[in-house]
């Protein structure tokens, strides 16, 4: 199978403008992401709408492509990038540009989901463990899966609701699963899902993947035990710097 990885990265961000170019351990955040992904997927590109990001990627030897500024999601930006890059691809991998600690094994896990020819879309889930505070956090979407590892639903709410137990006991009664926002799609499926109108579930939860479920697409969920640290705010960057120092 032929894989290509696209890292969508835009400069404009409400909470942290320019975060792909923020410096972490002496390198731009986007460079950390690119180096991790390209060590697994030879054909790796950054798709951006900003010259500063484009020039930075080319300066460190990466591949970048300019896209429109009006995309509503990273998935839409990836579809435009693939059309411009050209070539024949079996699977397209979507890695967020603000995930400098994405692990190579996580990318490999998502890729292996496509060993099953019936897989249309794949993503990752990580057990929450007994951290009820994290489970209750609406900024950490939860997944429930079926016996074959396909997503039944994603939600910012705690799913499932554990009846007859105090909230503090929920994590001891059910293995809650956190969604890790790494995606991969069959090439034809990516083209199809970017043409779907926004659905009511997506609007309610503000989770793009619900559009795909609502339209009958199946999402395979690979599992990982590795936590990732996304950079959404300047405070997240400070925490990431402290994390890196702890590794030295």
Question: How would you describe each model-predicted region?
Answer:
Residues 104-195:
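Conserved core of the sugar-phosphate nucleotidyltransferase
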Residues 41, 87-89, 116-120, 217:
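Short, high-confidence coil segments that cap the C-terminus of an alpha-helix
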Residues 48-49, 102, 185, 232:
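A conserved hydrophobic position in a structured secondary element of the catalytic/binding core
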Residues 2-48:
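N-terminal glycine-rich phosphate-binding loop and ensuing alpha1 helix
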Residues 43, 63, 217-220:
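Residue-level detector of anion-binding/catalytic polar loops
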Residues 87, 170-248:
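Conserved alpha/beta core of the MobA/IspD/sugar-nucleotide pyrophosphorylase nucleotidyltransferase superfamily
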Residues 45, 51-109:
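Short phosphate-binding loop-to-helix
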């Amino acid at each position: 199978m032929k894989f290509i990885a696209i890292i969508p990265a835009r400069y404009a961000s409400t909470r942290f403008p320019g975060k792909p170019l923020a410096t972490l351990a002496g390198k731009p955040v986007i460079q950390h992401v690119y180096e991790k992904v390209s060590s697994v997927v030879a054909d790796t590109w950054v798709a951006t709408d900003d010259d500063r990001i484009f020039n930075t990627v080319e300066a460190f030897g990466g591949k970048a492509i300019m896209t429109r500024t009006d995309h509503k999601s990273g998935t839409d930006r990836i579809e435009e990038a693939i059309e411009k890059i050209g070539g024949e691809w079996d699977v397209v991998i979507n890695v967020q540009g603000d995930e400098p600690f994405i692990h190579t094994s996580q990318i490999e896990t998502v890729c292996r989901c496509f060993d099953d020819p019936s897989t249309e879309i794949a993503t990752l889930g990580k057990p929450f463990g007994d951290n009820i505070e994290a489970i209750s956090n609406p900024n950490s979407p939860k997944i429930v899966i079926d016996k074959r590892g396909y997503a039944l639903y994603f939600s910012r709410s705690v799913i499932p609701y554990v009846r007859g137990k105090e909230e503090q006991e929920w994590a001891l009664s059910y293995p809650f699963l956190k969604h890790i926002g790494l995606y991969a799609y069959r090439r034809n499926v990516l083209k199809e899902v970017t043409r779907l109108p926004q659905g009511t579930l997506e609007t309610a939860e503000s989770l793009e993947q619900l559009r795909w479920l609502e339209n009958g697409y199946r999402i395979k969920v690979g599992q990982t035990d590795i936590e990732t640290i996304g950079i959404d705010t300047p405070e997240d960057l400070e925490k990431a710097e402290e994390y890196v120092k702890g590794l030295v």
